[in-house]
UniProtKB/Swiss-Prot annotation:
InterPro entries named among the record's database cross-references: DNase_TatD-rel_CS (IPR018228), Metal_Hydrolase (IPR032466), TatD-like (IPR001130), TatD/YcfH-like (IPR015991)
Species name: Escherichia coli (strain K12)
Protein name (record): Uncharacterized metal-dependent hydrolase YcfH
Gene name tied to this protein: ycfH
Cofactor notes: Binds 2 divalent metal cations per subunit.
Keyword flag Secreted: no
Role according to the record: Has D-tyrosyl-tRNA deacylase activity in vitro.
Amino acid sequence: MFLVDSHCHLDGLDYESLHKDVDDVLAKAAARDVKFCLAVATTLPGYLHMRDLVGERDNVVFSCGVHPLNQNDPYDVEDLRRLAAEEGVVALGETGLDYYYTPETKVRQQESFIHHIQIGRELNKPVIVHTRDARADTLAILREEKVTDCGGVLHCFTEDRETAGKLLDLGFYISFSGIVTFRNAEQLRDAARYVPLDRLLVETDSPYLAPVPHRGKENQPAMVRDVAEYMAVLKGVAVEELAQVTTDNFARLFHIDASRLQSIR
C-alpha cells in the first residue's frame, strides 16, 4: 500500500524530544505505508528553512507561500514568484483567507490570495487553500481569479456539503485531515461521503490536529494512515483502494510523474 500525506509542516515537528531528524519522521511514516509527503510552507523564510531542513529527496516535495495568518509580515511578491518557480516546488501556498483570527488583515489577505493564484496560473502550479470564517470571499476570489487555469485543493476541509459542491464545480480537490475523526464532526463526515473518490486527498496538517486515537499528541505524517482508514470506512471502500485513489489524485493535481512514485514503492 502507498499513502501520501498531502499536507504537512515538517519544519514544525518536535525534533528535540520526539524525532531524531527528518529521516526519523519519514521512516516512521514509511513503516505505516505513508511513503510520500508534501511539505507546506507558511512564510517565505519558512520555506527556505524547510528546504534546508529536509533537503532534496525523492519522497518529499514542497509548496511555497504565505499563510493568511502571516500577513502582518510584509513580503515581496517577486520573491514569492521566484521561489515558487523552483523545481522542487509543486504548489503555491498555503494561501487563502482566515477571518476568524485576524479579521483586521482582511484586505491584505485578499491581495495575497490573489497574488498566489495569479502566480499559480503563470507557473501552472496549483494553489493550496486555507479558509476559516471566509467561505463566500474564498469562493468569490477563486472564481474571479480563474483558479480553474491552475487548479487547487481546499486543505483541511471543515465546511459543509454545499461548499464542497461549489469547490468541485471549480475543479478543486478536497483534502480531509484528522478532524474528520473527531466526535463532533458529523457535518464534515456528511461532506466526506459526498465528495467523489476522484477528488479526494488525505492529509495530517502535522504537527496539528492529530486524529483519533492520537488526540492530544503531536501529529506526524505516519498518522495519515489513521485518516485514510477512517475515510475508507466512510466511503465504503477498502483502505487499499482509498490509498491508491488518493495517491493517483495527488499525482494528477500536483503534476508528479508516476515513475517517481513507482520508484519509491
